[in-house]
Amino acid sequence: MLTQTRVALRVLKNAHLTLPKRNISQSPALSMRLVQFQSSDSPSPRIGLELQDGGNIIDLNAYDPSLPCRMREFLEMGESALQTAKSALDSNQHILSRSNISLLAPITNPEKIICIGMNYVDHCLEQNVPVPKEPIIFNKFASSIVGPSDPIRIPEESQEVDWEAELAFVIGKKGKNIKEEDAMDHVVGYTVAHDVSARDWQMKKNGKQWLLGKTFDTFCPLGPALVTKDVISDPHNLGIRCRVNGDLVQNSNTNQMVFKTEALIAWASKFVTLNPGDVFLTGTPPGVGVFRKPPVFLKAGDVVRCEIDELGAISNPVV
């Protein structure tokens, strides 16, 4: 075990040593913050652009009625859809007041949600386990996705529901056997994710296979926006934090990731074809409840806020 710790410390030493940033940076005014939303005039999902984090929304479906109303289908259109969105942003038309809309998850029906376990050096140190030599892959079902302010429901089957703030990225271009040097061509952007986890089902039941503990309904809040990659300074050097009832429980930086975006795409695409709309959850930093002494788990009445610099924050009540 001492050897494992030394290996992890060597990896930590070689990682970027930028300290976690303290405040959420505001994205540039003309950033592409793609959202799905409902308005007071229409209960059906629509595609929009958030003018800034927490700002008003450009209704892309009003700007161009030929655009699909769901993000996956929008991304399947490829570069033409993004160019239309940029034109809408430049036009400054069809703006809806934030008070008249409610945000949904930026994507609600991906073909795949690919999740990475133990992908932060400091999270491996927290568990006193070796840093993985290959990505550890598991998944969630799309039925677990909820929006940036929707409730997280504690299932009757679990007494050990835990928090995990994560950086997520979304595929924008189909590919198989993708090389690392080409991987970013397949990424459309990034968002904030919360990999809610039932530790009893993940670690003690179901043969310790992770799926059931990870994929209860409401166990994948996403949002607030899908921020296109071109306006993010460096996705692998962003402060990432989680707060439970206002208390800071996770505080790290994405530079602690063992496998970055490019490596994850190259690895996963060896096994499966990646399609537009597929979501990757890239792992969580230290500070989760299960490894506290004594362990701490979520309960009804809690509020969990996950935030990442340049992307924004999601805040979900627990019921």
From Swiss-Prot:
The UniProt keywords, alphabetically, are: Isomerase, Magnesium, Metal-binding, Mitochondrion, Transit peptide
Where is this protein's transit peptide? 1-31
**Where does the chain bind Mg(2+)?**
E164, E166, D195
The entry's cellular-component GO terms read: mitochondrion
Q: What does UniProt give as the signal peptide span? A: none
Q: Which reaction does it catalyse?
A: oxaloacetate = enol-oxaloacetate
Keyword Magnesium among record annotations = yes
**Record bears the keyword Magnesium:** yes
**Which cysteines share a disulfide bond?**
none
Q: How is the cofactor bound?
A: Requires a divalent metal cation for activity.
Gene Ontology MF, one: metal ion binding
Enumerate the cofactors the protein uses. Mg(2+); Mn(2+)
UniProt-listed Enzyme Commission number(s): 5.3.2.2
Q: Where in the cell is it found?
A: Mitochondrion
A Gene Ontology BP annotation from the UniProt entry: oxaloacetate metabolic process
Give the primary localization class: mitochondrion
Q: What does this protein do?
A: Tautomerase that converts enol-oxaloacetate, a strong inhibitor of succinate dehydrogenase, to the physiological keto form of oxaloacetate. It is thereby required to maximize aerobic respiration efficiency by preventing succinate dehydrogenase inhibition.
* Family assignment from sequence similarity: Belongs to the FAH family.
Protein name per Swiss-Prot or TrEMBL? Oxaloacetate tautomerase fahd2, mitochondrial
Organism listed in the record: Xenopus laevis
Encoding gene, per UniProt annotation:
fahd2
